[in-house]
Amino acid sequence: GDRAKNAIFYTWDGTKWYFGPYDLDTTYGLHFNGTQISYAADSAPKTDSGTFWKKILVTYADELSTRYAELRDKDIFSVNCLYDIAAELSSKYTHELDKAEINKWPTKPSLTVTSRDQIFSWFNDRLAYLDNKFNYTR
């Protein structure tokens, strides 16, 4: 199931485990098939109801809130930072390469659903939700 959606746990020795991003097709609210925004930014992900994540959220509540506040205070977890990352990534690709991508994948469904503005808007709303969830105020 999707108990750890968009995440993977991995180990090299069976003792120390790592957590990383994986299969990010549903990021920023996008449905896995790319045809619609499937969940609102101000809603809890389905994974929050899973036993594993409930245990993590309860056991590490203080650490999660502290880390969240640190990332927000340093402007790392912000729309401005996301914008800078997107601009930096976009600068690596020429207009011709963008056109070639669209020509190769003309029926990519998310082309008509998402955009940078949609992502920034969704993320801004998500931050408001997370600020509330982690009791964060500036």
Residue ranges and their predicted role:
Residues 1-138:
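Middle-to-C-terminal accessory/interaction subdomains
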